[in-house]
Each structure stands twice: as C-alpha cells, then as structure tokens.
From Swiss-Prot:
GO terms for biological process: mitotic spindle elongation; vesicle-mediated transport. InterPro entries: Golgi_membrane_TVP38/TMEM64, VTT_dom. The chain crosses the membrane at residues 70-90, 114-134, 148-168, 228-248, 263-283. The gene is TVP38. Pfam families: VTT_dom. The keyword Glycoprotein applies. It comes from the Eukaryota. It comes from Kluyveromyces lactis (strain ATCC 8585 / CBS 2359 / DSM 70799 / NBRC 1267 / NRRL Y-1140 / WM37). It is a multi-pass membrane protein. Residues 91-113, 169-227, 284-305 are cytoplasmic. Golgi membrane protein involved in vesicular trafficking and spindle migration. It is found in: Golgi apparatus membrane. This is Golgi apparatus membrane protein TVP38. Residues 1-69, 135-147, 249-262 are lumenal. GO terms for cellular component: Golgi membrane.
Length: 305
C-alpha cells in the first residue's frame, strides 16, 4: 500500500501552485485558511473533524487541478488499492502461508542478499517505486537481525548516494523539475547549503516523502555536497529497524494458528507504525521550526545591510 501512496505523490506532484512562496502555499506548514481563534476554541474532537475537512478540501482541490491523464491514473491507483485490500482480506490465509514459505526458501539462497540490494538500488532512482515493499520483504526474510539491517541500510545508503550523484552530475535539469514539484522542498533549498546541512537533509529524509523522489529532488539544490548527503543517509539508517520489525511480525502471524498470538503480533505492528508516524511528524515539525529559525536569521542578516 505504501508503494501506491508513493505513486500518487509522484503523479500528483506534477501540478503545483504558481505562487512559490513557502508560507503562502496552499500546501504549507501553517494552515492560513483556518481562523486561529475559531480552532483554538474548539474541542479536540472538533479539531480532528476540522482538520479532516481541511485535508479533504485540499485533496479535492489538488485532484481537480490535475490533467485528465493524471486524474485517470489516480483513480486507477485507488481502484487497484481497493482490489488489493479485498484480495488480501478474502485470501488472507493463503497469502500469509505463501509469504512464510517464500521467505523461508529465499532465506536459504546465497544470492538473496545480492538480489535484494540490487532491487533496492534500482528503486532508488525516481520515478521508480517499491522501496517500502522491498524493505518489508527484507524483514520477512531475515527478521529483526543484524544481517537484515545491514542489507537494508547498506543498499539504502548506496542507492541514495548513487541516485543523488547521477541526478546532480548528469540529470540536473530533471532534478530541478523534481524540486519544483514540492513547494516545501523548493522553499527550504536556501537553508540546505551550509557545511552542517546534513542534519537538515536527515530531517527531510525522515519526513513523509517518497524515497526515490527525495534522492532526485535534493540533487537539484545547489550547494549540497555528496559527502553531506551521504552522512544524512547514514544518520537515518536506524529507521530500517521499523521495516524489519514489521516484516518479522507479519511472518510470525503467518506461522501461527493461535488467535491470541496473531492479535499480539497485529497490535505490535500497529504500535510500531504508530511510533513511526508520531516520530515522523515530530521531526517534521522540528524541521519546520528549524526552517523558520534559519529564515529569520537570514532576514536579520539582510536587515543589517
């Protein structure tokens, strides 16, 4: 399902507002179209409803702004996702058994690590998708182990750096088009050119952006060195543990017939995903705060002159 989300972002990102100002964008950090005092006086339930309506409205506006071809692609992906969910529910037992058997068989093959690494390297280049699927597959095969983490982390770092280098050196014009697809990334490009930019890049890497998209888009920002991009990716390698954990729990669910054990595994998957989501959004807002601080510092430096 994560891959379908990545595909939506890749297809939907081609349309963007003509106004490139970060804080005036319809897809910005601050909800400027909501009245602050009205939201402040709402209960937490009313705030959830308000945010839901706002996101639904923004989604409809973005969909209406797409061309017919892109609308058809989004609809196709939505229908495909519904079909996959239906098949998963109906054929759950057979699917789980097949996953367990396949993972056990692949674990015994000497070439499996090499194949996984090559596939992850391949999907590191935009607009290819499949990183989330391959990461979960690594967890299914090797579980929460050092070997699984090493395979996933190493191939992720190498693939990211390789994709970044190719887009920076050979496909820079295409990388610039990628960065213009997302107003947030385009706006923060001015604060990603320092010697310590790897911290900001690491925060971007942990934010909810498609894996391959980030590799190519950041290459379109002038002043970012391959060294800093590589350091940022190394810093974020612990995130691979979440994929391995979820993959291992999925395999455990297929290996047992106990309802209570399956329930525990399912709850642990939900908790792991919840932890990842909370951590991601916490870092997202930390990133927003840091961006505003750097913008303020730059503005103050200009005011001096």
């Amino acid at each position: 399902m994560a891959d379908l989300y990545e595909a939506r972002v890749s297809s939907g990102g081609l349309s963007r507002p003509s106004d490139t100002d970060f804080l005036d964008s319809n897809d910005n950090f601050d909800d400027l179209d909501d009245d602050f005092l009205d939201i402040y006086n709402l209960s937490w339930r009313q705030r959830i409803v308000q945010h839901g309506k706002r996101h639904l409205r923004n989604g409809k506006d973005k969909f209406n702004a797409l061309s017919r071809r892109k609308k058809a692609l989004v609809v196709f992906l939505g229908v495909l996702e519904i079909i996959l969910i239906f098949i998963t529910v109906v054929k759950r037992e057979a699917i789980m058994k097949g996953l367990v058997d396949a993972s056990n068989d692949l674990r015994q093959k000497w070439y499996t690590p090499l194949v996984l690494m090559l596939l992850i390297l391949a999907v590191s280049f935009p607009p290819l998708i499949g990183y989330s699927f391959l990461s979960l597959s690594t967890g299914l095969i090797y579980g929460l182990s050092f070997k699984g983490w090493f395979i996933l982390a190493m191939s992720t770092v190498i693939g990211s750096v390789l994709s970044f280098t190719v887009f920076q050196r050979l496909l820079h014009s295409h990388a610039e088009r990628l960065i213009r697809m997302n107003p947030k990334l385009e706006a923060v490009s001015s604060v990603l050119q320092g010697n310590d930019s790897y911290w900001m890049i690491a925060l971007i890497r942990l934010c909810p952006f498609p894996y391959s998209f980030i590799n190519g888009a950041i290459a379109g920002i002038y002043g970012i060195s391959i060294k800093n991009f590589a350091i940022a990716n190394i810093i974020t390698t612990p995130k691979a543990v979440i994929y391995l954990f979820v993959g291992e729990r999925l395999k455990n669910m297929g290996e047992t017939d106990s309802g209570s054990t399956r329930l525990i595994n399912f709850i642990s998957i939900l908790l792991a995903n919840g932890f990842l989501i909370l951590t991601t959004w916490f870092l997202y807002y930390r990133f927003k705060k840091r961006y505003l601080e750097l913008q303020s510092e730059q503005q103050n430096s200009f005011d001096i002159f």
